[in-house]
Structures are given as C-alpha cells and as structure tokens.
Amino acid sequence: MTFRIDCLQYANWSEKIFRQMREGGVDAVHVTIAYHENFRETVLNIEAWNRRFELFPDLIFQGRTGDDVRRAKETGRTAIFFGFQNPSPIEDDIGLVEIVHTLGARFMQLSYNNQSLLATGCYEAEDAGITRMG
C-alpha cells in the first residue's frame, strides 16, 4: 500500500483546503501548531484543531500512530499529525514533553531559527550545538 504524506505544512486551514487534500489523495499531514508559542498558546492551537476535527470528521482526524495513516487511506480522510518548529511549548519544563505528547504532538524540532533552551538555531552567529537541557 502506498501513502501520500505531506511532511510539513502550515496553511490558513479551512474546509476548502481539507477537501483539496482529499482530492489530491493526501493521507496524512504534519501540521505546524507551534513556531514560538508557549505551552498555553499551543494548547489554544490544539483546541482550535479539536473544533476542526468535530466540524469535518468526514475529511480529517487527529493522527497519533502510523496505523492512523493506513486508517486515513482506508476511510478516505486525512490524518493530521501535530508538530512544533521549536521546543517553546515545553518552556523550561522537561515534564511538559509527556503532556504535549498526550495532547497529540508527534514532532518537535530542537531549534528553529534562533537559540532555544535545547539547541542553537541556524540564525545564531555562534553554533553552540545542543545545550545541557537538550
């Protein structure tokens, strides 16, 4: 079985886009739900996605495992996987990793463009690499 997966996407999400994904045969999408948001702001983004899942259950659902990609293909829907471009949602609390995973996050970059608590970003003049927390 072959799958079509969009490995990273950020858009002005709407029913029109969800229908276009289905027309294009997209089985799964890694959706950016945090660039530089803190934990609370990220939870608000997840809340907005939960409303979309309720409004468009015939088009999308929250993906959590590889089996969800298969289920999406079999049911003619798109599995939405949450990801962060930077670890800002975990703030300075490593325990929040488990919490955001429970809420559905499946991808988290150690850094985006700037220095994070975990690693150096590509825009930094000095590359210090992974931090002690990272």
Regions inferred by a protein language model and the residue ranges of each:
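N-terminal hydrophobic targeting/anchoring segments and the immediately downstream early-domain regions
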Residues: 1-128
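Loop-centered beta-sheet repeat module
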Residues: 130-134
